[in-house]
């Protein structure tokens, strides 16, 4: 998993609340169990006018040329609600997004995002709205996110602090998923296993 320390990138706003996992990646695209190839289906029902995904919806922000290459997504509260599917952060990451900023996230999505190297940042409603206004008002507006300093910097230079539990921050800074984090305790695990009584082994 790619480590995350700081990132500056083009930001795009989807000014909607309660964006659920079925909107992020519809259920008909969940048959794969590998993480790649989901980006093309991200927000499928909003991005395309047809079921085959051959007719882009020109009104949807991710299809607009000014947001091509966006790596930071801004959204409203309760992002990632709905059914638990790890494919949702897979699709966001495969599309090229590194950060999602919103006033709140569904708990399961929040954990899945961190476990897959996608940084979910919680800011206040007013701060998210300011970011959206700046991004929508300036062509090519970039937002910076510093995980070491726990700061978001808006296109105008406004700084917004955010918090993240230290265990999640450690995982992202070091590029560790759940398996990778477990492997960092390899010596302790081996020492424990070496002391297990034979009758329990």
Swiss-Prot record:
One of its GO terms (molecular function) is 3-isopropylmalate dehydratase activity. The keyword Amino-acid biosynthesis applies. CDD domains: IPMI_Swivel. Pathway: Amino-acid biosynthesis; L-leucine biosynthesis; L-leucine from 3-methyl-2-oxobutanoate: step 2/4. Keywords: Amino-acid biosynthesis, Branched-chain amino acid biosynthesis, Leucine biosynthesis, Lyase. Pfam families: Aconitase_C. GO terms for cellular component: 3-isopropylmalate dehydratase complex. Heterodimer of LeuC and LeuD. Its EC number is 4.2.1.33. Belongs to the LeuD family. LeuD type 1 subfamily. This is 3-isopropylmalate dehydratase small subunit. It catalyses: (2R,3S)-3-isopropylmalate = (2S)-2-isopropylmalate. The lineage of its organism: Bacteria, Pseudomonadati, Pseudomonadota, Gammaproteobacteria, Alteromonadales. InterPro entries: 3-IsopropMal_deHydase_ssu, Aconitase/3IPM_dehydase_swvl, AconitaseA/IPMdHydase_ssu_swvl, IPMI_Swivel, LeuD. HAMAP family: LeuD_type1. GO terms for biological process: L-leucine biosynthetic process. It comes from Shewanella denitrificans (strain OS217 / ATCC BAA-1090 / DSM 15013). Catalyzes the isomerization between 2-isopropylmalate and 3-isopropylmalate, via the formation of 2-isopropylmaleate. The keyword Amino-acid biosynthesis applies.
